[in-house]
Amino acid sequence: MNGFLLVALGGAIGASLRHGVGLVAVRHLPLGWPWGTSFVNIAGSLAMGLLAGWLALKAEGASQEARLFLATGVLGGFTTFSAFSLEVATMLRSGETLKAGLYAGVSVLLGVSALFIGLWMARRIFA
């Protein structure tokens, strides 16, 4: 199957999931913090760690198509670092410097930590 089509199909799934998370966050969590974006960035990092670990440990022969669909498509559509950047910039432009710094720092720290936890989990599950 064409790589662009696989990425597009996966991206549609990931973006739809991201939209759903955003709707749930807006309806059920306190306003004033980008909960949906925070969640998808951290969960997406965890999922990428698990996927990378699985591909390295158990799916050496995984097709390029599977990698394109899952990593570039689904997870690329799900995670939202471009939205994250916009939200940080918006906070900074609004004079919310402390909030922007806290949001950026916590998101990056937890995202990278979640990726390492995902890799660790993959070694425990798939090795």
Swiss-Prot record:
Transmembrane stretches, start-end: 37-57, 68-88, 102-122
Protein name (database record): Fluoride-specific ion channel FluC
Membrane topology: Multi-pass membrane protein
HAMAP family from the UniProt entry: FluC
Record-level GO cellular component terms: plasma membrane
Catalytic activity: fluoride(in) = fluoride(out)
Organism (species): Hyphomonas neptunium (strain ATCC 15444)
GO BP terms, alphabetized: cellular detoxification of fluoride
A molecular function GO annotation: fluoride channel activity
Signal peptide: none
